[in-house]
């Protein structure tokens, strides 16, 4: 790709039309933070409270979704699985972690992070959300934001074409 340089003398005023610049620029950025405690022992995916509406500015835009959940288990041999959806479209299961409870009451899995580059192909509002389920048929349950200080987050970043 050829580089274009722009030399400006001091005191120049006006605007530069963005149509002259290449794609790949960052459009809007939306951040959602959630500290709602949720637990499940079900093997079926259910919505977490981490959900955010987003309206792309062009049908050619891509949306980079960056999610992070604080994951725990209540006890026993269990695990957690997380997946990402755009409205009702499943974008994929990204996290499956689990294991035995350590040191009696230690139940942390830690931070589960995942990234996804979506092409929603719309200028209408869409909603990105995560779902969770108990991953292992064990005796315990999976939790997000379980300690009272934990927070999960979702950052949505529009990449302009």
Annotate each PLM feature:
Residues 1-37:
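Glycine-rich, low-complexity segments
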Residues 50-52:
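Extended, low-complexity regulatory regions
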Residues 32, 38-39, 44, 56-125, ...:
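Terminal beta-strand-rich extracellular "head" domains
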Residues 46-48:
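Short, solvent-exposed loop/turn segments enriched in Ser/Thr/Gly
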């Amino acid at each position: 790709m050829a580089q274009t340089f722009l030399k400006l003398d001091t005191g120049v005023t006006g605007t530069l039309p963005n149509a002259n610049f290449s794609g790949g620029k960052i459009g809007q950025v939306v951040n959602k933070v959630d500290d709602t405690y949720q637990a499940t022992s079900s093997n079926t995916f259910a919505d977490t409270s981490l959900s955010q509406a987003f309206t792309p500015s062009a049908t050619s835009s891509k949306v980079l979704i960056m999610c992070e959940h604080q994951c725990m288990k209540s006890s026993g041999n269990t695990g957690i699985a997380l997946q990402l959806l755009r409205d009702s479209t499943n974008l994929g299961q990204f996290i499956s972690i689990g294991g035995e409870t350590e040191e009696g009451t230690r139940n942390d899995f830690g931070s589960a992070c995942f990234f996804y580059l979506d092409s929603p192909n719309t200028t209408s509002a869409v909603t990105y959300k995560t779902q969770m389920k108990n991953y292992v048929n064990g005796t315990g349950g999976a939790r997000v934001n379980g300690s009272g200080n934990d927070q999960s987050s979702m950052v949505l970043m529009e990449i302009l074409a």
